[in-house]
Design a protein with these regions (language model features):
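Short, cationic-aromatic polyanion-contact patches
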Residues: 10-35
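Extracellular and analogous surface-interaction loops
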Residues: 98-112, 197-203
Length: 245
């Protein structure tokens, strides 16, 4: 008690020697009990670019894996080929791809933040450094922001591209990051709207819908190249990070 400075002691003369006198240091004690802090958890889901569940595309379009083209080029019907799940690069001039991410882990929690990142660029025949495209992300049918990509990037080889991929083709993209926060939605750290993470209703359905594409009324309808973990500059697929309590 002395070490905790709750009391102090003094020695006083007594009838048969000395006695120890205990004196309190404080008149009142206030005891505060901390509320248990909710532990935050993070779930990371990597979605291969060929694992789309729905699409609407128009030429120029195609799919490749690390070995070769999957079916022919510029034929939207080829996007149904079951080998699409091995795809490492997907491209299309118009339309969208839709993915479904699992949400079982957040059913009993509260989502604080969702982050989605992917390597992207425009789509032109071969490549074209002057080819803008307004690439939009939708999450559960709500717009999460549009990035105007300036180019279908080429002119130097993508760091991960296999040797057989020709130099005249699209080579790399830019890594773009959309973030859903409690106070709004951000693209590469810049706020794009006031739609909060709760507004996307991430746990309401059986999955989280993610759609990447170009609007039919977009100013720059320059298509999309979507890179997997073996093409372009970044060794990743479409990556979703969910922070929840």
């Amino acid at each position: 008690l002395e070490e905790a400075q709750l009391i102090r002691t003094e020695l006083k003369p007594g009838v048969r020697g000395s006695m120890k006198l205990c004196l309190r240091q404080n008149d009142e004690l206030l005891l505060l009990l901390r509320k248990g802090e909710k532990k935050k958890k993070e779930e990371v889901i990597s979605m291969p670019v060929g694992n789309y569940v729905d699409y609407k595309v128009a030429p120029t379009c195609g799919i490749v894996n690390t070995e070769d083209y999957i079916d022919g080029e510029d034929e939207p019907r080829c996007f149904y080929n079951p080998l699409r799940t091995t795809a490492k690069l997907v491209w299309f001039a118009k339309g969208y791809l839709e993915y479904r991410f699992p949400n079982a882990g957040i059913q009993n929690g509260q989502v604080r933040r969702l982050e989605l990142s992917a390597e992207l660029c425009s789509e032109a025949p071969d490549y074209n450094m002057e080819w803008p495209s307004d690439i939009t992300l939708w999450i559960n049918q709500r717009e999460a922001g549009t990035w105007t990509c300036p180019s279908d990037f080429g002119g130097r080889r993508g760091k991960l591209n296999p040797d057989w991929w020709e130099d005249k083709n699209t080579q790399y993209g830019k890594l773009k990051v959309w973030t859903l926060e409690e106070n709004g939605t951000y693209l590469d750290g810049k706020k794009v709207n006031d739609v909060s993470v709760t507004d996307y209703c991430l746990a309401d359905g059986p999955f989280i819908s993610v759609r990447i594409g170009v609007k039919e009324d977009a100013k720059h309808q320059g298509g999309v190249n979507l890179f997997g973990n073996s093409f372009g500059d970044y060794p990743q697929d479409i990556v979703m990070r969910i922070l929840y309590e």
